[in-house]
Amino acid sequence: MGQKISGGVKTVSRNDSQSTFKPIIPRELQADFVKPARIDILLDMPPASRDLQLKHSWNSEDRSLNIFVKEDDKLTFHRHPVAQSTDCIRGKVGLTKGLHIWEIYWPTRQRGTHAVVGVCTADAPLHSVGYQSLVGSTEQSWGWDLGRNKLYHDSKNCAGVTYPAILKNDEAFLVPDKFLVALDMDEGTLSFIVDQQYLGIAFRGLRGKKLYPIVSAVWGHCEITMRYIGGLDPEPLPLMDLCRRTIRQKIGRTNLEEHIQQLQLPLSMKTYLLYKNRR
């Protein structure tokens, strides 16, 4: 699921039992799917510390009663097997500025008919009777339905939009167990990244709001983990940070630490290039 095939991502035709393969970034649309520089910068940095991940984890006080955060793993919640119920949980931290990225781990076998990931305000509903794509059902939330490949916002009044946008009607994008959510409150956009491939902007117009990570689930005993990757402030990066990024780009990510250690540089500079001064 989500395997790279000749630079693309696997898609499945709904009208054919045979798997079909096509590039996720067609040549004519390639510019639309270029990963924004700030996202690239953030993903090049070391992931957030455990303490910061816990700060941005699921909120055990802001959830459906059919959900609980695990005692032995505060980054993961468990949903009770309650029939005819759709259940949500919000993250602890409401985001108003900066770029933020978090990883969702949601096993494909635990998604069921309605599995939605996105963001919401503090007023978005967290429970409904029956099965539905609850995230994105009102004006207070924005969600990506992983099974339907649809984006929903105020879906009671507005139809869902296909995402990734390049999918044809007879294709379904298989979202793997792990993927990234990128919320840029400075630009007011929400986007997703799968297998290091940026899938384009899912939602716009989010500036000026206070938004929380959220998922809605229907599968009994499903367990979903959220791991905060990190954030970037709105201010431009210092010149030293930009120089570090340029050097790391020139070296490349393969065996990066080994290559940096071989450079004829002072230890303090090697430490800086490897971000070891941060943790």
Curated annotation (Swiss-Prot):
Domain SOCS box: 234-279
Any single Gene Ontology cellular-component annotation: elongin complex
Domain named B30.2/SPRY: residues: 36-233
GO biological process, one term: wing disc morphogenesis
Region (Involved in binding to the Elongin BC complex): 236-279
Localization annotation: Cytoplasm; Nucleus
Impact when changing residue 147 to Y: Does not affect binding to Elongin BC complex. Abolishes interaction with vas
Cystine pairings recorded for this chain: none
Keywords from the named record: Cytoplasm, Developmental protein, Nucleus
Signal peptide: none
Tissue expression remark: Expressed in ovaries, primarily in nurse cells and oocytes (at protein level).
Main localization, broad class: cytoplasm
PROSITE patterns: B302_SPRY, SOCS
Disrupted-gene phenotype: Homozygous females produce defective eggs, which desiccate and collapse soon after egg laying, or embryos, which hatch very rarely. Mutants exhibit wing morphology defects, including blistering, formation of ectopic vein material, and loss of material at the margin.
Gene3D superfamilies, alphabetized: 2.60.120.920, SOCS box
The protein's role, per its UniProt record: Involved in the localization of vas to the posterior pole of the oocyte. Required maternally in the germ line for efficient primordial germ cell formation.
Quaternary organization: Interacts (via B30.2/SPRY domain) with vas; this interaction may be necessary for the transport of vas to the posterior pole of the oocyte. Interacts with Cul-5. May associate with the Elongin BC complex composed of Elongin-B and Elongin-C.
Protein family according to the UniProt entry: Belongs to the SPSB family.
The protein's name: Protein gustavus
Organism: Drosophila melanogaster (Fruit fly)
